[in-house]
Amino acid sequence: MVEDIYDPLDEYINVFRDKFKKVSKETFEELAREAAIDVEANRETCRKVYDNEAVLAEVKNRITWWTVLCVVLWLLVIGGALVILAQHENWPIENLLIAGAVSVLSLVFLLMKVHPRLSDLKRERNNISAILSRLKEEAWSQMAPLNRLYDWDVLTRMMSKTVPRLEFDPYFTTQRLADLRKSYGWDDSFNAERSVVYSHSGLINGNPFVICRTRKMEMGTKTYYGSKTIYWTETVTDGNGNRRTVQRSETLHASVTAPYPEYFERTRLIYGNTAAPDLVFYRKPNGLAGKEGSLRFKWDKYRLHRKARNLKDGDFAMLTNEEFEVAFNTSNRNNNQQYALLFTPLAQQSMMKLLQDEETAFGDDFDFNKAKMINVIMARHMQDLNLDLNPRQYQGFDYDKAQEDFHRINAIYFHAIYFAFAPLLCVPMYQQIRPQSAIYGQDMQQKSSFWEHEALANFWGQDHFKHPDCVTNCILKTEEKQQGDGSTLLTVTAYGYRSVRRLTYISKYGGDGRYHNVPVEWDEYLPVAGNGRILMREDNTQEEANISQKQRLNHIGEILQKSHLDLYRRHIASKV
């Protein structure tokens, strides 16, 4: 029986880090065996590639220095000639002879030595570049069988082998979304103003989760500036009593602040669990774990004590572990009893270890929002990662580098995703409570949800759908229509903005005692919507347990050929 994870930090250090390395190594070795790569031949080709790159860099460096010398000598030739022409009547004959000699010698050296040398070096550069292109083409050809074997699910398969009770869906299904709505109270209003960039759904300990990145537009402001210089004359009296007229000038400045659409992308982990079903709280990082002696810790502790004594503002009661209360700080919670059941002493201990560790984990870097049975983790370390998992990132022409990149990239992904789950794994009750569907099993209706449709549209790119006049990012939304042959037609609407240049005059008081209209140009952003269509078909074939990667890719090829579609991504074939 698989044991639950109650101390995610220790489990990662002692078990999962090395276990994932082993799984990653075995996965790459299996892919390489299937590809039947001649590793030694590729290494020899790559050695020649890198040797020629080094020679090419040296040749380019020499071309640079010879070019500098060429420019200097031409300046001497031209400069000497100009000096002779300008000073032939003023300079003594010996100075003119010296200038002439410098020009002539420079010209001779240019024509006899520098230009031929530059020509030889450029010819050598072109020859090496041609050889390098052929060698790289050969190396890519040697690696082509392996590059073809990478697919969209390679990381999720490795993670499921590494972490017990972690399962990933082939794509975000309508059943998974309906389960989140009906069983856990998920509210689709979250998606109203957002577009899904990518999503990965599944189960951990039988409870549903979604890792998603969304794009949202918020109307902010932008300030534009303009200026106008004014001139006037004044009559002044000097120290001797004489009156005279002087010219004055001043530059007047003005600004206009106008609405400006701003786009933000955020990555979240959404998790459903029926434990503590009425509990609501929100916490954000404060960096106070392990900082008991700091002034801020003492101040926050004092404020929590004061809030606990103030019964008018609610029934907040502090746990006996005050260090945890200050560091995790969920004083906005609505149910002390359910909170205490959820965050047991074991959970508090594991959470404190997680918050303090910045060597293996990421420390206190996450927001934790619990809205009854929906939990949302937004970790800072996830925001800069592209978790679309496009297999092209593994492809390369150098076997050894491809192997290194495969392990490095997937280790980064696993580390980041694992510690996004870690705050949830700290809570024993989240692992002890499982829904009926997870205990008894439930057949899933394999139809893709609108989350997956939006992610597919964003993968194809905004340029396929945006309005011709759109100058901003777009929020892509989709509508589906089932076709008679089992495929689905998606209508994609791209909501963006066009800009119109405006001119506004702002009245400013000048030093001449008058008001002046200062022009300020600014952009007005007006909404536009573009449209496009995607034809798609889900691949619901049940995969055999011991299927090889070649068999998997042959199956994908058959799907694309039969459906006349162009792209296979995450078990969905599609074309624009």
Where are these regions (language model features)?
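A residue-identity detector for tryptophan
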Residues: W65-W66, W74, W91, W140, ...
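Basic, amphipathic N-terminal segments
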Residues: M1-T64, L132-P164
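Charged, long alpha-helical assembly modules
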Residues: M444-V576
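N-terminal topogenic membrane-targeting module
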Residues: A35, N42, M112-G226
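Transmembrane alpha-helical hairpins and terminal membrane-anchor modules
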Residues: E58-L135
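Structured extramembrane domains adjacent to transmembrane segments
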Residues: R176-S507
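Generic surface-pattern signal
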Residues: D51-N61, V68, E137-W140, A144, ...
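Acidic, low-complexity intrinsically disordered regions
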Residues: C70, Q87-N95, K182, L295, ...
